Structures are given as structure tokens and as C-alpha cells.
Amino acid sequence: MIDLKNVSYETNSRELFSDVNFVINAGDKIGLVGPNGAGKTTLLKIINGDIQPTSGDIISSGEEIGILPQNLNKWLDKTVYDFIEEVTGVKSAREEFDYQCERLTQEANEKTLLIYGEALERYEKFEVANFDTTIKKALSRATLGDIDPDRRLNTFSGGQRTRIALAAVFASRYDLILLDEPTNNLDDSGVILLEDFINNSPASFLIVSHDRHFLRNTAERIIELTGGKGVNKYNLGYDEYIEARRGARQAMTDRYKQYEKEKKRLYRVARDARIRANSAKASHKKSDSDKLNDNFRKERASSNIAGAAGGVESRLRQLDEPERVEDEIAIKFAFDEVSSKKHSLISVQSLSISHDREKIIGPVTFNVRPGDKILIQGENGSGKSSLLNFIMGNNTPEYHRGEIKKGENAKIIYMNQSQSLPLKDNSPLDNLRYLSPKLELHDAINILIRFGLDKRTISSTKAIDLSGGERAKVLLAAMSTNSPDLIILDEPTNNLDIPTIEALELALGQYKGGAVIVSHDQDFIKNIGITEKIKI
């Protein structure tokens, strides 16, 4: 059992989250959701021990915890074997065991024997002696059984590296496995393999994901991190969580409206009572001795009315204010009207591409007109990103055959799957104005706020320090202001939070230009009105 108690974290004098409390039990399959920038990845790193919380504690019963990476850029110079050995904890378990064996031969006592026993226990838990067999089975399960484990990661395509990351999950022996956006760039068959592994594994999983289909198929509980105080916990699957959340927010809204209504009523009663009391007090005339008794009665009535008013005011002060539902940023945007009315925006005819004399794509043929939404499908490593990059002129393959024709004066905007910004050391605001130079300063600020970026983040945070979802939002903001005739999107839902994905779905559904899209997000594909699917 892992118990988070009042965990808080601050960065650059900004509180990311506070008072986070929840328990992870053996075998739990938990989805961790929340808006971009709420601190989900940071929380995973805290649980894994990579960073320390500002306050609070992580209490465990000795469980082995590991975070499995989705992005392998840090390990590109390592071999497949070395990478998986490191991220699964096998390397550290082996090295510690070897060290304690050596130490025991030099200094045998009760203390060294105890430490040796702990190292041996970890060595056996991670099945270090059988790791060669483990990695072979894991690679085979990830449909990579024919690759050489001694080959370096930088020699594989992006799609193949995604599968290698999947194999690392299969090879892990942690009690709690932390996954951060594990379906990013993973093809449909890979997602199914991962879902099956999670559902049948005895390990606990804490999964950060915005893939609704994947969460629906894996998460038995949902924890919602909103970037404020505490978390919202739901012992429900994803669809049930959505309904329960909607109902809970509506109930909170109704309670607050009732509170406001009662508050206004009591205020009116107290105000009217005060007016009557003052009116009664002003009407008596002390100089008229003949009306002494009448004045006395009026003073007493005035006093009684004032007392009643005071009682109502006291009730008003004691009225408990219920928790107010925070307004959710409703991200709504549309792509500007297209400038081109041309019949064809881009035409790809019998295109084949190869590297190292090995054909990786083709032949591929498709034509994009205004209103078309073309989905490019294929397994990891099939060359989908290579195709898009070649269309955009971003790479030159060793060999290609076929033809690409772009519509004259057609404005094409491309978002690659890395979602990188051009000015890494500059703010989101600087990047948006660089990508959309015609934007006025106040318009650029308002657009970024509308896309859900924190006001402090907009001008003070470097692009390199943004979360993946925040970077993607800056790119989408730029795309929405540039009137593109053709949009080319490579895994656009990577890292985006669910409200932004839903806003993108709506915008694409209403978009009159052409779109070429690579995506494995099943809900997203279903909701954007794909007109043609191209399998490569």
C-alpha cells in the first residue's frame, strides 16, 4: 500500500498542487486525470522519488515503484538491452547485489548480512538471473522478437522506439508501475497489447492519460488532480466518473445558488426591518407630553423591530457558505476561414519512399480537397511520420518515386508529434507572436488564456519548461489564427487534456479546409468526421 498524505509542491514560487491525499492498494488500476499544467507528471515523479514534495509524505510498505518512460530521447545512445535493464530496475538490483556480495566476503557481520539479504531479495524479485529470457519474451510480446537487443536506440524509427518502450513495461517487475501518457504514438495493436497487460497484471498501475478509449478499458478508479487543493476521488470506471462528476458539479452549483438565494432573502428582510425600525423611531415627538404613552409604545415597537433586524443579520452572518464550483475554462476555438477555394490542396500520386534500400512507404496515392479529412493509418514503424515530413519537405529520403503536387498559394500548417515550439528559451506569448506575427499583444494574450494557459505562465515561463500539453495548446492557438487551407497533424492529441481534445474535435468538425491526420486516438478519430482512410 502506498499512502499519500498532504502532499504539496511548489515551483518558482507557484503552488502547483496542495494537500493531495489518496491511497494506492495492491492491484489497483488508477487513471490520473486533470488539465494540462495541473502537475500530474510532477506527482508521478514525487511518488517515484525523483523529486521531493514541498510538504507532505509518501508512506509505503516497501513496495518497489517504477516509472516507465514513453519518450526515449534520454537513452538514444544506449542499446535496447541496456535501456530496458535500466528502466526496469534490473541494473540497479544487479549492481547492488554484486556490491553486497563483495562486501560480505570482506566484512561478514550481522549488519552486512542483513543488507546482503535485502539486496538478495530485490535481486530475486526482479528476476535478475533470468533477465535475458525476460527481455526476449517482452520484445516478442511487443512484436519485436526479431530485433537485436544489442542495437542502439538511435538506429530505430520513432515507431519502433515506441514499441521498445512498450516492451520495457512488459519486462518490469515493479509492485507499482507509473505510466505517463503510455498510448502517445502507440498504434492500435500496441494499445490493445498494453490494455491486456494492465488488466491481467498483479501489479498496481497509476496511469496519466487523456486517451478516453484507453482509460475506459483499463482504469477501475479515477483520481482527478485539478491543480489546486486536494484531489477528487471516484471509485468508478471512466464513463461512470464522467457522469458522477457532472452530477456532483451540478449538485454543488445548485447548493451554492440556494445559498445565494437565501442570503439575498435574509439581507432584504434585515434591510426592511431596519427601515421600519428607523421610521417608527422618527415618528414620535418627545415634546408633546400628551402623547407620552403613545411615544413609549412606538419606541418599544421600534426597539422590537430593530432587535428582529439584528437577529436576521446574525443569521445572515452564521449562514454557512458552501464550496463554490470553480468555473472550468471552456476552450472553444475555430480555424479561420480558408483563403483557398482550389479544387486540390495537395495531390500524392504513387509515392514510394525508402531508406537504406529498404522500402518503408508506398506506393501511396491520395488527393486532398477543401472539406476532406484524410486519416493516415499504419503500425508503429510503418513510416507515417516520415510520409508527412517528406510532404512538408522536412526530410530527403535515400530514394523516392512518385509525385507530390501542392495547390498554388495554398497555406499549409503542420504540427509534428513532438509538438516542439520554435523559441525554446522564450515564453508562450513570444512563441505565439512569432508563429502569428500579425497578432496584437492583447489579442495574443487573450487567445492563450482562452486555450487554458495560466496567466503567469503565458509571459514568464520558458517554452522548454512547459508541459507537452501546454506546448500543444500554443501550437493550436497559432494554427487557429493563420487561416490554413490545409492542416497536417501528426498525433495531435498527444499530451492534450480532454477538454482541449474535445474542443479540437469540434473545431475540426466545422473546418472547411483540408486535413491530413495521423492518430491512434479512437474517440478522436470517431468524432472528427474522417472522409477517407489511407493504410500504409
Where are the language model's segments positioned?
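ABC ATP-binding cassette signature C-motif
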Residues: 1-256, 336-536
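Non-transmembrane amphipathic alpha-helical segments
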Residues: 93-104, 119, 259, 263-277, ...
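Short coil/turn segments at secondary-structure boundaries
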Residues: 98, 283-286, 327-331, 445, ...
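Short amphipathic alpha-helical coiled-coil/interface segments
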Residues: 112-123, 295, 309-319
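Alpha-helix-centered segments that form part of catalytic cores
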Residues: 124-125, 129-135, 301-313, 317
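ABC ATPase nucleotide-binding domains
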Residues: 250-292, 298-305
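Proline-centered turn/helix-capping motifs that create local helix->coil transitions or kinks
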Residues: 278-283, 318-328
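Short, flexible cytosolic linker that couples an ABC transmembrane/permease module to its adjacent nucleotide-binding
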Residues: 325-340
